[in-house]
Swiss-Prot record:
This protein's GO CC annotations: mitochondrial membrane
Compartments (UniProt record): Mitochondrion membrane
Topology versus the membrane: Single-pass membrane protein
Broad class of where this protein is predominantly found: mitochondrion
Name of the protein in its database record: Genetic interactor of prohibitin 7, mitochondrial
Length: 258
């Protein structure tokens, strides 16, 4: 009996040590990137599942990157972007793409809406780093064009808000309420729930947004794989529970297998 328990203990110890390892940041970044690409229609559910399994398997490889390596890589990239900003690369990019006028410290709003979706990943990352750097400053110390970028990142026509008109003088189409709720402090006004006709379906504002939410659904092949994995996990879980409840059954199974 002891000769069978010994390898089981080793396997249990190895599984415990491996499962206690924290997932590296690269895995989280890759998963976030795949979700974004799947929403844009660039990947289907099956490819997403296969890619996720590959990343999980890479965690157990001897040459896999550690969390410290990931943090060092992110820090180096951040330092590189800040050096680019300090060298004036950001201003040159904004002047070229959005017609930045340094005399009034403003950009063309129309160009911002039209040209921003055409930027490549490196250019967007440079702008995002600049916006994050200025977010800690006092509002009066932030340049006007950086305020424009902050406002665009918060409310502009990009990502899920793609194809929604960007006009600061009008209420956005995806505003939650068609009729705004009044503010009351007298304690006498009755509060009631808004009718469905007074609400906006945020999922069907535009065709582009509707497609984004449709692509998040799992295809039949992925659902089949997922339910199969759940079923196998339940079966093995029940068998493991039965073995733990009846030690004699474990001895019988091992002795019969010899």
């Amino acid at each position: 009996m002891s000769q069978y328990r010994f390898p089981i203990r080793i396997l249990t110890r190895f599984y415990t040590q491996a499962s206690s390892r924290l997932p590296p940041k690269s895995l989280l970044i890759k998963q976030a990137d795949r979700i974004r690409r799947s929403k844009d229609g660039q990947a289907d559910g099956s490819k997403l599942m296969v890619s996720s399994l590959k990343d999980i398997a890479s965690m157990f490889q001897a040459n896999a990157e550690t969390p410290e390596d990931e943090e060092r890589e992110i820090l180096n990239q951040q330092n590189y972007l800040r050096q680019q900003i300090e060298s004036g690369e950001l201003e040159r990019l904004l002047q070229d793409k959005f017609n930045l006028d340094e005399s009034i410290s403003l950009m063309s709003t129309n160009l911002l809406v039209q040209q921003f979706p055409k930027l490549n990943a490196q250019q967007v990352e440079l702008i995002q780093e600049a916006v994050s750097m200025d977010s800690n400053k006092h509002w009066n110390e932030i340049p006007q064009y950086m305020k424009q970028l902050q406002f665009y990142f918060a409310f502009g026509s990009h990502g899920p808000r793609l194809s929604i008109p960007f006009n600061s003088r009008e209420k956005p189409l995806d505003f939650a309420f068609k009729i705004p709720s009044p503010v009351t402090t007298d304690g006498q006004t009755k509060i009631h729930k808004l009718k469905p006709s007074h609400l906006v379906n945020l999922h069907t504002i535009t065709d582009q947004r509707s497609k984004i939410f449709q692509t998040t659904k799992l295809d039949p092949a992925t659902r089949c794989i997922l339910w199969s994995a759940i079923l196998v996990s339940i079966v093995f879980g029940v068998q493991e529970w039965r073995l733990q409840q009846d030690p004699q059954a474990k001895i019988t199974v091992l002795s019969n297998s010899v």
